[in-house]
Regions:
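Sec-dependent N-terminal signal peptides
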Residues: 20-25
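Conserved beta-loop-beta connector loops within the AMP-binding
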Residues: 371-376
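C-terminal motif of bacterial Sec signal peptides marking the signal peptidase cleavage site
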Residues: 29-30
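C-terminal tail/sorting-segment detector
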Residues: 378-388
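Non-catalytic cap/lid and distal C-terminal segments of serine-dependent acyl enzymes
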Residues: 38-347
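Bacterial N-terminal signal peptides that target proteins for export
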Residues: 4-19
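Residue-level detector of functionally pivotal "anchor" positions at catalytic/ligand-binding pockets or at interdomain
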Residues: 345-370
Length: 388
């Protein structure tokens, strides 16, 4: 508490801050415009989290990975038809997906595929070519350098859009489209991309997509992370690897990871446990310590960590970027690390040495702490102070 405030004044200011935050938008890619105030009915803190569960802190991407590699992949546009899954009476839409094809692509070989989903107001091209659509981004340089330096086996990356028109929309329409993207993903996008390139998909039937699941990953940032969780919830079996960044699952309601983390985690665990692939999946969950969406991600992650029969070291890990905000700097760093884990050149090297922090002795990021400190509070578990 600041020294120039009395206890009552501090509590009053904290409560005012909390109410303002609960009834306004943060102006970020995963915020609601409904302004509804909710009660944190089921905030999951460090209680009952296994003492050996560790947050894994990512390290910055080396600066040379943002430089152009000598062996550069290409960015190609794939267009495909898809239904409007928000309303069956509407006509089919013609949609773009931008595809990173690695240097030295050989049609006689098979390639793993990762799909990366943009956040709210984003477009399909921005991950690889920027909003202008004409400049290779830092993420593409990272792809090139990871492959050229032998840190990843060559892979194909796809940047689609869950938006039927590939343009910025209001929050309500965007969330409706994100909620049904899993149908397009399985029915339209996977067949369109993975039959055009040499992948592990041999037929476009549901059985064929299932048969190639071990070589497929999907991830996303912000509302793209929420969409990734929708895919996990609605089409879990069709992808083996998941990379949700700065966003939660909404099966229990909007921002369910923040408000109802234990119920959310149980729902996800129950879903996994009814699948024949309950021991054959991986979630690489990530957020920045200064991200305005940390409450959604962190509370859900800790709740998932309690359910060790389902989410354990073989199927789940939780990562943080120190000082990371709700921006592409964090996304690039998470992708840099996750891709080495998903597609290692040597399977034995998939688990790499990283800075770790035990939840039992480390920090607790609680919803009440976030709100009382302007959405960015880091509450030390011993309760002595709040950082920033």
């Amino acid at each position: 508490m600041p020294s120039d405030l009395t206890s009552k004044e501090y509590m009053r200011k904290s409560m005012t801050t909390m109410m303002m935050l609960m009834t306004s938008m943060f102006g970020c890619a995963a915020c609601s415009s409904d302004g509804a105030s909710k009660e944190a009915a089921d905030v999951s803190e460090n209680d009952n989290v296994p003492t050996d569960f560790q947050i894994q802190y990512t390290t910055p991407v080396p600066s040379e990975f943002f430089q152009a590699a000598t062996q550069q992949g290409t960015i190609e546009l794939v267009e495909y038809d898809s239904k409007d899954y928000t309303q069956s009476s509407r006509p089919a839409t013609h949609k773009p997906a931008y595809v990173y094809v690695p240097y030295g692509y050989d049609p006689s070989k098979q390639y793993d595929v990762i799909y990366l989903l943009h956040g709210w107001t984003g477009v399909a091209e921005e991950y690889f070519l920027g909003r202008s659509g004409n400049s290779r981004t830092g993420l593409v340089h990272i792809f090139d350098n990871l492959i050229q330096r032998g840190l990843c086996r060559p892979f194909i990356a796809v940047s689609p859009t869950w938006d039927k028109d590939n343009r910025s929309k209001d929050w309500g329409e965007s969330t409706r489209e994100a909620a049904v993207f899993s149908q397009e993903y399985v029915n339209d996008l996977i067949p369109a991309v993975e039959t055009r390139y040499s992948t592990y998909l041999t037929e476009t039937t549901p059985e064929g997509i299932l048969a190639s699941r071990a070589h497929r990953a999907i991830g996303g940032f912000s509302l793209g992370s929420i969409t990734t969780w929708y895919v996990f919830e609605q089409a879990f079996a069709y992808s083996r690897m998941y990379l949700p960044m700065s966003g939660d699952n909404w099966s229990q309601g909007m921002y369910g990871g923040a408000y109802y983390p234990d119920a959310t985690a149980k729902f996800l665990a129950d879903l996994v446990n009814t699948s024949p692939y309950k021991n054959d999946f991986y979630v690489w969950y990530a957020v920045g310590t200064e991200d305005v969406r940390i409450d959604q991600t962190h509370n859900q992650a800790l709740a998932m960590a309690k359910l060790t029969d389902t989410f354990n070291v073989n199927t789940f890990s939780y990562h943080m970027k120190e000082g990371g905000r709700h921006d592409f700097n964090a996304v690039w760093e998470f992708c840099y690390h996750a891709l080495q884990f998903f597609f290692p050149t040597n399977e034995a090297s998939a688990v790499r040495s990283v800075k770790r922090e035990s939840v039992a002795t480390g920090r607790a990021y609680t919803l009440s702490g976030m709100l009382a400190s302007g959405g960015r509070g880091i509450q030390i578990i011993d309760g002595k102070k709040i950082i920033k």
